[in-house]
Regions:
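N-terminal segments that cap or nucleate solenoid repeat domains
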Residues: 22, 26-66
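Glycine-rich hexapeptide-repeat left-handed beta-helix
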Residues: 2-41, 75, 81-84, 89-96, ...
Length: 211
């Protein structure tokens, strides 16, 4: 088969005697890779940095952002990143086959190098830098999981809680002004950055300077 014939077959091309998968990229440049025939789905209004890795059964919803070196690996269970959520540098989302999926709700901030494995994070939550949330855990809305905290498998964190430590424990309830300052402000700032980057990308595609 010639190289030209390969390109005509659904975008596939031969490499070293085998057929390579067509290349798909998310807004922002992240390479999307299929797993067992399932491709990631990224909303056109989301932004995913070109160094992020997004594999398999992954959904990234409108306005969400995925930052440098993030890994979203949907090979063992499905992953969903909710609308206007940010997955920050070096974070990893994964699951356990036959046991769990990972769901991140809307307007969630997942800090640098955090790990979410087979858990559910409800809307309007802040996951601190380096925090870990394990299989079957549920973090209800308006929670802050402190930097480096570990939420154990199967644990449920009540709405409006501050969690700290290893193992993670609820240390107190959050005040309304803390929810506004830590959770809402973080969401708004990363949404602003996402829209800025999407605007720059659109301008570059048209040959225009960014904002």
């Amino acid at each position: 088969m010639s190289e030209e014939q390969g390109r005509g077959d659904g975008g596939l091309r031969p490499i070293s005697g085998r057929m390579a998968v067509e290349e798909r990229r998310a807004p922002g440049g992240a390479l999307l890779e299929p797993w067992d025939g399932v491709w990631p789905s990224v909303d056109p209004s989301a932004w995913c940095h070109r160094s992020a890795v997004i594999i398999g059964d992954v959904v990234v919803e409108a306005g969400a952002s995925v930052w440098p070196t993030v890994v979203l690996r949907g090979d063992q269970g499905s992953l969903r990143v909710g609308a206007e959520s940010s997955i920050q540098d070096g974070a990893v989302l994964h699951a356990t086959r036959g046991l769990s999926h990972t769901v991140v709700g809307a307007r969630v901030t997942v800090g640098h190098r955090a790990i979410l494995h087979g858990c559910i994070i409800e809307d309007d939550v802040l996951i601190g830098m380096g925090a870990i949330v394990l299989d079957g855990a549920v973090v209800e809305r308006h929670c802050v999981i402190g930097a480096g905290a570990v939420v154990g498998a199967g644990k449920r964190i009540p709405a409006g809680s501050m969690v700290m430590g290893v193992p993670g424990r609820v240390v107190r309830a959050l005040r309304p002004e803390e929810i506004a300052a830590w959770i809402a402000h973080g969401h708004e700032e990363y949404l602003r950055l996402t829209r800025l980057l999407l605007g720059e990308a659109a301008g570059a595609a048209l040959g225009e300077p960014g904002p």
